[in-house]
Amino acid sequence: MKKLFGLLFLLPFIGTAQDCKLIRETDPFTKETKISTGFIFVNGGSLTIDADKKEVVVLFSINNTGRCFDNNSTAIIIFDGLKSKTSARNGGTMNCEGLFQFVFKNSASTTTILQRLMTYKIASIVFTDSNKKESTLTVAPADQDVILKLATCLINESKTLL
């Protein structure tokens, strides 16, 4: 009887674990595992979250080609249900392909921005490029749920790579 209650208690966790559809790749040379959400398409561009044992990278691809981003470019994330905005700088290299990155060290503790990605839905993100021009990614409610679920799965799974 106790075992039955134990199994019933674990059932919700097993059900949600099966919803994580992450892409898992192993580098043939280094034998290191990398996990990814794959690209999630939103209004104005797309995003993907990747992780290996060293870092977690959130990569945004903005549709407006010709947008140049450097280390002084910024992004302001507006979360649903949160009054304050989150601001971050580009962690990637200078490019004019419309690519913007947040780069975080993969560690046992989760940084504030990653924690917010796991707990709040993204309403929109405003990117300011190297020419001080703004581009906005707007996230539809259905996409908000997908991003929240995949971000939570990937960030939790990234801890197993350490």
Residue positions per predicted region:
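An ectodomain-focused feature that recognizes extracytoplasmic/extracellular
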Residues: 18-71
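Internal interaction segment
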Residues: 83-162
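Residue-level recognition of well-ordered beta-strand positions that form the cores
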Residues: 59-61, 76-78, 126
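Bacterial Sec-dependent N-terminal signal peptides
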Residues: 1-23
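Extracellular/mature segments of secreted proteins
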Residues: 27-31, 75-78, 104, 160-162
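Mid-length scaffold segments of soluble, non-membrane domains
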Residues: 65-87
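Residue-level signal for mature regions of secreted extracellular proteins and peptides
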Residues: 10-13, 60-62, 89, 146
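Generic marker of residues within folded, mature protein domains
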Residues: 7-9, 48-50, 65-67, 94, ...
